[in-house]
Amino acid sequence: IMNIDVLSFARLAHRIFEEVGQSHRAVLDDEGKNLILRKIAGDYEKDLKVLKGNMKKLGYISEVKSVLSEFDQYDIGEEELRQMKVAAGENSRLYYKLQDLEVLYIGFKKYLEDRFITKEELLDALCRVVKGSDILKESTIVLDGFTGFTPVQNRLLGELLEVCREVIVTVTMDDRENPYVYKHPYQLFALGKHTVTSLIQIAAERKVSVEDPLCLYERPLYRFCDNSAMEFLERNIFRYSKECYKEKQGAVRIHVARNPREEAMKAAGRVRNLVRTKGYRYRDIGVIVSNMEV
């Protein structure tokens, strides 16, 4: 147990930088990004066509920051932005929004040069030093709780596959599904299948062997050991079968409301009742809605 470290990708990067003696620029957090973007927006205000009037609105800088962060995560640079502008066409409002984002992106990157590094760029810096790490050469890396990986994370995984003794990735999957066949993003367990097929492709490109999967499909699941109705629902929801649960149960209730307000009041009343009379805590309860704007 003493040899186990629980780390995020960012903390792993810092650990390896310390080992290999890699000096790197200070890592910029979200608040720092917001402050710098506010300055960039002021410096380039005259070049902004669509976003100029919005940059001073409450929370707008944070939204732009999130967009620029996703650009880094998904390998969208200046050239990709230009291609997106061409695809949008000069007659569309999207064209000028992308043009403003391009101005802010270039200004942001220019300001960071030789000063700071973002969390998104940290993993690219880690990719360049992975092969020099003795810690990683003797390590087993276990990735748990991920629904998928960004392109920069996939590049890092490719490096880790070549260097580490073993890389283990956990994926949520039903025993009736083929994890190696990804067809479209709307199929059941699409995120897990996309993760598996992407990792298989990365391993093939790096000429790394892939072991047979270890499938933990024991039934009944521990969380349903005293609730067969919920286990039946878990196995059959979104599957168009003719199976019916015929035993008496009280785990699933259906309430028909006349309008969204009545529906919300019923849910809130049920939550309050569970907390006051059944010993529940609010953190034990989840409310899932299809549309928060209704």
Stretches found by the model and what they are:
Residues V6, V50, V142, I168-V171, ...:
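A structural signal for short, well-ordered beta-strand segments and their strand-loop junctions
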Residues I1-Q83, G89-S92:
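Conserved P-loop NTPase-based nucleic-acid remodeling module centered on helicase motor cores
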Residues G32-V50, V196-L216:
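Extended, charge-rich low-complexity interaction segments
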Residues D29-D30, E79-L199, A203, E211, ...:
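Conserved helicase NTPase motor core
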Residues A10, T172-V181, L216-L221:
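Short beta-alpha junction loops
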Residues V130-G132, A204-V294:
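Helicase P-loop NTPase motor core
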